[in-house]
Amino acid sequence: MEALKTLLIANRGEIAVRVLKTAKKLNIRTIAVYTEPDAASTHVHLADEAILLSGPPSKAYIDGDQIIDIAKRKGADAIIPGYGFLSENSNFARDVASAGLAFVGPSPESIEAFGLKHTARELATKAGVPIVPGSQGLVTSEDEAVKIAQSLGFPVMLKATAGGGGMGLLTCNTEKEVRESFQTVQSRGEALFKNAGLFIERYYPSSHHIEVQVFGNGQGKAISIGERECSIQRRHQKVIEECPSPFVTRNPELRKGLCDAAVRLAESIDYGSAGTIEYLVDDESGKFFFLEMNTRLQVEHGITELCYGVDLVELMLRQADAQLSGRKGLEAEFLSSIPVGAPQGFAIEARVYAENPVRDFAPCPGILQDVDWKETTGSRIDTWVYRGIKVSANYDPLLAKVMYHASSRQKAIEGLRDILTGSRICGPPTNLGFLAEILANKDFNAGNTLTKFLNNFEYNLAAIDVISGGAYTLIQDWPGRPTVGRGFCHSGPMDSVAFRIANALVGNPVGLEGLEITLSGPELRFLGPAVISLCGAPIDAKLDEAPVPMWSRVKVSAGQRLKIGKTTGGGCRAYLAVLGGFPNIAEWFGSKATAPMVGVGGYQGRQLTSGDYLTISAQIPESDNELSLPEHLIPQYPDSWELMSMPGPYDEGYLAPESIDMLYNAEWTISHNAARGGIRLLGPKPTWARPDGGEGGAHPSNLIECGYAIGSINWTGDDPVIFPQDAPDLGGFVSSHTIVKADLWKLGQVKAGDKLKFRATSLKDTLLARNELERFISDIVQCCQKGEDFGSITPLASSLPPAMSSSTRVSGIVHQIPEKGNQPLVSYRQAGDDYLLIDYGVGAFDLNHRYRVTALKKVLSEAAGDISVSNGLINLVGCGNYLPKALMIYYDGTKIPQQKLIDYLCTIETQLGDLSRAKVPSRRFKLPLTFESKRQTDAIKRYMETQRPYASYLPDNIDFVARNNAFTRAELENIYLTASFMVITVGFFTALPIALPVDPRQRMNCPKMNPSRVFTPAGQVSWGGSCLAIYTVDSPGGYQMNGMTIPGVDILGTKRGYAPEKPWLFEDFDQITFYKVTEEEYERQLALFQSGRYEYEWEVVEFDMAEHNRLLKETKEEVKAIRARQRKAQAEMDLLEKELLERWAKEKAERGVSMDTVEELLKDPEITVIEAPLNANVWKVEVKEGDKLDKDQVVVILEAMKLEIAVRAESAAAGAVVEKILAQPGKSIEAGKPLMLVRRG
């Protein structure tokens, strides 16, 4: 290339990637432009430089002035527009030239000449190219249109002269339809193309859409490069394209006429660059007529390249280079040397879109959770997508152009279909199956490719159309992801008993994915036959108005609707199994289970909603065997529960003895805050055995961090929360007892308002109950598989094992090794029948003990034999907590006896020996940090507006942390910028790193926000208790917000520094350091991260434990003085916080309405009460006093179990006026209590 050295690509998606490949081949430097939704797009990664466009994303790619300005600033020589957007904008082409740059495309005059279809027809006529019989110029009235239509003969087509892409045209078969359509086409032309002009053409119902590729040098020389057929269209949008045309192949004499006419037309206007002349070819006569000329590169240009061995983009760039060099264009001799004879072989292209085939192919944005193209010899896939990319609603949903080139048309069809059926795209629905069925169609294979081909094409789907998603419907499988850890949620069904039995009844493996339905269910339209089973809590369900029996195998016919209503009794979750599961759902770490709190797994990492699309098995057995579980085998779902639990890990020494008794003796109530991430209990307050949480925090329930077990009873302050499937795997609060594995399924069915008691159980009885439960499920599975009667199965025991008395109950500590020399005290604490927590030492936080955890974890991870990751060990969570340092071991208690595990761990302790002089491998990271950020300010503002208006830590978290530790703000910032923060654990939610300063003089302490925030931006640097944390995703949180940095997680593992098998960045004993940046510089680096181009700065180092221990010894007295100052400052801040908290609580109470007022109003016969339908939290009040209500109007939105429940004005309240609002946002309310009083007129 002589003059074209730098190229700006003014486009996105696959065409931008396609251009980049040729530009790189020609050693042209490339500049990409992109919008925020496209930040992670492939063209951004591949370009030499990428510039973020400003303005609304939907308009940024057509902001010609901005794009030209970028090109000039960045030293571009030319701009290539691709197709769409600015590619056929003559004003843009002219502006590019005026800026001294080359427009890689035809001249503005050529674009204008063919921009309006009626003038293009005139040019074609002058060039001797036959046109479709029609009007001469534009038609200005209905009467004129009718007259012309009558002279042409019906059917006719009304076309907007500025239209394109199948928009702005209608077919008319009668005079009446012409009159009805005239105004419609005019208005569409004006709305879509700013031009209301229209013309009329004769419509040929049996025709082909065939186009000829041309290339001109702008000096009167043009060549044709064969034809393509694009007859397979939906709503005039191309779906399948072929080169050569099968119709032309059968009528070879037609090729010369088509190509010669195309060349004449291009040469008649001195066309320069690539262009396409489109024809309508009558199937009966073989006559061809000019339709339009596209003055740009076509989407389907690739199949021409495959059959003719040319690179059309290269030709366009060489033409631009010649123009820049002053030669006006390529030499005629050069064009003549390009081989343009008969095509070599056959190529077919299929356009793959993210679109819903059951919703009229509506575009479907969303995250592509898996992308796996099958590529073979002969294939070419032009795409911009990959695993993890988000398809934006702002742009065309084209994902890829899949092409296949072969020696014959039949081989090309077979090869392309093989690619389509062998490729896998999970996330929003696509048209892959639709395209494959077209290729399998006998008429298509025979070459009968008329433009009306798809009018009557039948696409047989094996899928479910989600009409409505229900209150909270998730895809789950069993057992979920027990081995991932790092805060990515265990996931899986909350009630695994009902889930597994549902699968067994339909004939699935018990762990196959199904639907978990909470409180009220979805409405599903089955597009193909299916076999289903609905199990779990009693719930109303109908199949085309016929009741659906629960705990039964049910056959569903194509077209039937399953409507699952509300739960009707005890329990809150039901499970729907479908034979074959849902093949289009991607696996993440080997599971399809949804973890909605961290946005992974399932359908887009979220609950189902209207418009979602689930594929199902197309292979349905013909057998009509009915199968139902006998009533006496169906589990019971009461509203009062008793759950077996075991002490530990932190009972004695944390809770006072009388509070341990209280836990078992009290009757607890399930709060409205009962969800997959935690089930809060209402009941008596505990007495604590210690005054505070030490380095973990001011409250005795606080720890620095420790591992959490599923089923743990965790104390967040004085309130207990049970941790179910989606709970964090570590945190900073005491877990005193743990519900045993045999009773975890019951947690999935407790609902707000239910009563609950705990029963102390021995390990022996726990394992017996667990084996009994597994035997029960196994027996049912075998009967379902063999078709046997269920009569031999023993029901689940209705009674629990004998409760242990306070005198026979044991401590959570099941074994200890005394301190000896440099080997610390080791305490082994049980957490139910599947978890064991190993504690090291007694005293303040000590990295020596934390390294011992790391060393133990390494030995266990590499172990082989009876106790190993492949044999009974499930997961390991290393933490640092209040006094000791700990490792939580998650193991299978049915495979490894607890005592055997303890014995093995004791042996390892002996082998570890003295680690006080160890040299520990470490990585030291250097991250940007800005203390001032709009993201952080907005999060605090949101908190103050919606949660708590004032507190000791508001409005400035940084100032609070400084004052709480007797520092100035400058001193606190200096700590952040000079300290090395040691990562002591990675977990909680989404691999959040928790770290402490290595130098004890730089350690701090501060309370967490109360209440916790509902929103924290990703990248937030925060402090809570004694720890620093970096929030890796947008999430709730309670640590004080002190600055912003780069997050350390990429969920699908596609960004630099990550991998699908390791989507987290930080590991234990990594070190984090910060350097200060401005907010502007931070946003620049964050944009690099979001686009996948950020390069983390880190180095491999050794952490010397001996040197660290010397530091601890040398600074001991200095640290004591620092702690004394900090304790004094913290005491002052504690007093302030108590005062502000009491004032806030009082103000909230005063905003309520007195019961005397309520009772007085209720005496009025015209007053009607709108009640809360369930125990919940008031989220929003949607009306105000004095409003008149409409029927079904939403008056209040409640939040319960992480669900939004809309309370509506039913018919009795329709027309009434709101008299008194009793519910206030943020307040809890019980089922049946009044939300507001309304007065009927």
Curated annotation (Swiss-Prot):
Residues 3-459 form the Biotin carboxylation domain. It holds the Pfam family CT_C_D. GO terms for molecular function: ATP binding; hydrolase activity; metal ion binding; urea carboxylase activity. CDD domains: biotinyl_domain. Induction: By beta-alanine. Keywords: ATP-binding, Biotin, Hydrolase, Ligase, Nucleotide-binding. InterPro entries: ATP-grasp, BC-like_N, Biotin_BS, Biotin_carboxylase_complex, Biotin_carboxylation_dom, Biotin_COase_C, Biotin_lipoyl, CbamoylP_synth_lsu-like_ATP-bd. The modification N6-biotinyllysine is found at K1202. ATP binds at K117, E201. Transmembrane segments: none annotated. Residues 121-321 form the ATP-grasp domain. This is Putative urea carboxylase. The gene is lamA.
